[in-house]
Amino acid sequence: CLYEAYRTYVLHDKANQLQNVYSILGGSTHDVLEGITNGEATEEDLLPTIQKDLDELQMLDINFPSDSIRDGWVADMTHFCKTYKAPKGKFTTEEFFLYKSPNGNYLQGYIDLIKHNADGTVSIYDYKTSSMYKGEDIKKHGRQLIVYALGLEQKGYKEILCI
């Protein structure tokens, strides 16, 4: 529905979106990472944010599919939070893209992070916090970066590196 798309993509109405353990944790992690890149947060904000969200999820009885998945996710994200270093350079966060396919259909969304490289190219980054993104599946999900690149090309970007 057009109104739901408007609420999601223009108003950023999170109440309009299905809430599950991955959307909640991923959303807050993305927010802190964006804040770090924009100078509004620090690396030290990551782990407390995740711990607070895990406590709230437990209180609300919103659970991971299994305890072993939860334990693995917590271990992986704790390691990430303790080792993450803010990127250096010129960046754009949450860049809107609109891609018109050859058959006339449109895809739209927001790119988590674009790095503007010294040589005039850009690199596209997309944060993934779900345990779904591993092994061979990561290649399939990496196609998302190709769609982002196509959208940026249509927007006028000339040299794009997908990462």
Predicted regions and their residues:
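A residue-level signal for conserved active-site and pocket-lining positions in enzyme catalytic cores
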Residues: 1, 29-30, 113, 148
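Nuclease catalytic cores
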Residues: 2-41, 94-95
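Residue-level signal for well-ordered alpha-helical scaffold segments within enzymatic catalytic domains
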Residues: 8, 31, 35, 79, ...
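Short coil/turn segments at secondary-structure junctions
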Residues: 13-16, 61-64, 132
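Conserved aromatic-histidine-acidic binding/catalytic patches
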Residues: 17-21, 65, 136-140
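Hydrophobic (often cysteine-bearing) scaffold residues that line and stabilize catalytic clefts
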Residues: 21, 25, 69, 73, ...
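A non-catalytic, helix-rich entry segment at domain boundaries
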Residues: 28-95, 100
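Mg2+/Mn2+-dependent nuclease catalytic core
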Residues: 91-163
